[in-house]
Amino acid sequence: MTGVQTCALPISIGFVPSYSMHPLIGKVANVEWVNGFRRDDFSLDVTAAVKQIADLKPALTFITTPNNPTGSAISINDIKELAIATAAVNGLLIVDEAYAEFSNEKSAITLIAKYPNVLVSRTMSKAFAFAGVRLGYLAANKIVVDALQLVRLPYHLSAITQAAAEVALEFQDELLAEVSKLASDRDLVAAALTEMG
């Protein structure tokens, strides 16, 4: 045998428009990015998404709920369908819940026990107004967390960030109270825009 053999990179998929960092995460993980499709109104067509997952067999499937930038949320039943579809192709479903506190939908964290291929990422940047601290967290099956521990950067979280997060959690009731006001104002603006056409 002569020459160099190459093999195709694994695939990751996300349904655009969505959070712009997901393709970069795929690139860092050495997987090819594929733009999945949404409807013309930017809502996620779960039936079409399940078909795309079955056809492409992605190693990583990204969804964001509520979606950034559209604000639309995905129901827990739709996420469950995506979890089943990704499990069928031995893939992981990464559910970005950065804006979860602004949604009335049930969290995908409730699916992890039954669907170990579901990973849920969250951040303190949004609801806790903690963007400058750059602190996020992941909820996943223990096996997934153990695997991630093997590749995480050492000293990835400073003592100052940890201390600031502890203080924020002590005041979470006050900080999260602002979320309801923001959500209420958002709904008023959305209703006014809808009325204007």
Q: What residue ranges belong to the model's regions?
A:
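Short, small-residue-biased leader/transition segments that mark boundaries at the very start
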Residues: 2-9
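Structural scaffold positions in well-ordered secondary structure
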Residues: 7, 61, 96-98, 121, ...
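Substrate-binding/gating loop at the entrance of the active-site cleft, primarily
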Residues: 13-31, 154-155
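Short beta->alpha connector loops at strand-helix junctions that form conserved
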Residues: 16, 35-40, 97, 122
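Short beta-strands and strand-loop turn motifs
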Residues: 33-37, 60-67, 93-97
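Active-site pre-lysine segment of PLP-dependent enzymes
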Residues: 44-56, 69-127
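PLP-dependent aminotransferase class I/II
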Residues: 117-194
